[in-house]
Amino acid sequence: MGLSLAAYAGAALAEIAGCFAVWAWWRLGASALWLVPGALSLGAFAWLLALTPVEAAGRSYAVYGGVYVAASLLWLWAVEGVRPDRWDMGGAALVLAGAAVILWAPRG
């Protein structure tokens, strides 16, 4: 379980950072050099997501979706300086609950 959570959290950080590098270049006028660490970060994202001990890729991606939503809101607050509102937090709680059901449901 610890490896799963660490892999999902690391994947979220890597994907969000990689996508933000593209956002910074495309939307904020940052140097195209931002694309280099962005691409490396997106590669790390894929590698970390493949480390999860879930038996099916689609199920792993579904669980990751919940983690991604929550991590994106943390990024919004920590990096962009925009505090998530109660609707953001409620939505994150819902998707995390769904991700937990998918990840920890007893399967035969």
Curated annotation (Swiss-Prot):
It comes from the Bacteria. The keyword Transmembrane helix applies. Its main location: membrane. It is a multi-pass membrane protein. Keywords: Cell inner membrane, Cell membrane, Membrane, Transmembrane, Transmembrane helix. It holds the Pfam family UPF0060. GO terms for cellular component: plasma membrane. InterPro entries: UPF0060. It is found in: Cell inner membrane. The chain crosses the membrane at residues 5-25, 32-52, 62-82, 86-106. Belongs to the UPF0060 family. HAMAP family: UPF0060. PANTHER family: UPF0060 MEMBRANE PROTEIN YNFA. This is UPF0060 membrane protein Rsph17029_0436. It comes from Cereibacter sphaeroides (strain ATCC 17029 / ATH 2.4.9).
